């Protein structure tokens, strides 16, 4: 049976918890995702715990648990200039190293949430099996990551692990580096392969560079590309 909980006090414990979930990088195991498309993807992936709706709301977004907020409170939860019709309370689903699969992406120190969200979305589009993050990456549940992933965050296994531990599982590791060989030398990725992309400013960490075969995209006129663009090119190349 659907249940609507009215919240009108900004000091209420429930509302204060919702504000914590908005950050997405806390340890509560819950994050917020905004908009109709996110509602659909969260529902399909069984990640949806509850919905949050504004003062005037669409009954379509009333679920087993729905928080009904005054607009001034709803606005505090939203990152959008125009208020979305629904905000979804979702459960985090971090995977472990056993979920890497046959063809994965490793991100070493990625800091820009837009880059991470774009890479997650592209990896899903080109049928990569998982995204593995170093421990110093931006949180995959940052609101900007969620928005730029366009819902892909709900369908792509996300893992946090050290690259050295993946090496121990006998993965074929291909590391993007300015001093790498031309990626055209590789006809296709063998089974159990992982593509590694580094931090926007500093690239892959020094201690990780020796863990695999270094490759690069041959370019003329410039030294490097945005990491999300580089990742998209290579993911398409080796899909």
Feature locations, PLM:
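Boundary-proximal intrinsically disordered activation/regulatory segments immediately upstream
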Residues: 1-55, 137-138
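Active-site regions of enzymes building and remodeling cell-envelope glycoconjugates
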Residues: 61-74, 102, 171-173, 188-194, ...
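Amphipathic alpha-helical repeat scaffolds
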Residues: 35, 111-119, 224-230
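Active-site/ligand-binding-proximal alpha/beta "capping" segment
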Residues: 175-223
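RNA substrate-binding interface of SAM-dependent RNA methyltransferases
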Residues: 94-180
